[in-house]
Amino acid sequence: MKNPIIDNIPCVLLAGGKSSRFITNNIQTNKALMPLKSYSSLLEYQYTRLLKLFKKVIISTKKSYELNAPYLLEKESDLFSPLFGIHNAFLTLQTPYIFFIPIDTPLVSFESIKALCGIKNFSVTYAKSPTKEHYLISLWHQNTLNALIYALKTQNYRLSDLVKNTSSVAINFDKEEEFLNLNTLKDYELAVQILKKRANG
């Protein structure tokens, strides 16, 4: 069955991170460019996959990639915080709600994303797995803009502080696996195995 497309909420793929813990052959590697399944990069995999669910997918990053897609460029070159991408997205897209997801969480199911996008009476609706809060796999409302501006002004880049100071709600999901974050090469290799298993299952 084809997924009904979410056409009233844009999806912003957060890809402006540092990849500081992602090391291949003793070299820090940009994980966005690691191949995944039949795709040339994690970036292409996530972008293509999310377009099956959202009418509009935009990539938030520090510089545009070869992948032909709409980009939101973060101006802060030496500072790495997803708050810049979230703030920039609201200023640029001028839309009440935006769904955010990091590039390095390729296993999140469409069911989970739809559940998060279905709860609209909070400033931030975020995913929570058995062991962790996932503040970046979340639906945000534009009424968080003042809090975002204040956090950036005071240089408090802790997402948890900002989310807890807004009217936020955690949606509990029981599968830890789908929220695997590809911080390291080991995480990436695990995700490759999981996707292989899913394809064969």
UniProtKB/Swiss-Prot annotation:
Residues engaged in binding GTP: L14, A15, G16, K31, D104
Cofactor(s) listed: Mg(2+)
Keyword set, alphabetical order: Cytoplasm, GTP-binding, Magnesium, Metal-binding, Molybdenum cofactor biosynthesis, Nucleotide-binding, Transferase
One function term, GO molecular function aspect: GTP binding
GO BP annotations listed: bis(molybdopterin guanine dinucleotide)molybdenum biosynthetic process
Residues noted as binding Mg(2+) in the record, renumbered to the chain: D104
GO cellular component, one term: cytoplasm
Broad EC category: transferase
Location within or outside the cell: Cytoplasm
Tree of life domain: Bacteria
Catalytic activity, EC: 2.7.7.77
Catalytic activity: Mo-molybdopterin + GTP + H(+) = Mo-molybdopterin guanine dinucleotide + diphosphate
Keyword Kinase: no
Domain note: The N-terminal domain determines nucleotide recognition and specific binding, while the C-terminal domain determines the specific binding to the target protein.
Family of this protein: Belongs to the MobA family.
Database matches in PANTHER family: MOLYBDENUM COFACTOR GUANYLYLTRANSFERASE (PTHR19136:SF81)
Function per UniProt: Transfers a GMP moiety from GTP to Mo-molybdopterin (Mo-MPT) cofactor (Moco or molybdenum cofactor) to form Mo-molybdopterin guanine dinucleotide (Mo-MGD) cofactor.
Complexes and interactors: Monomer.
Protein name: Molybdenum cofactor guanylyltransferase
Gene: mobA
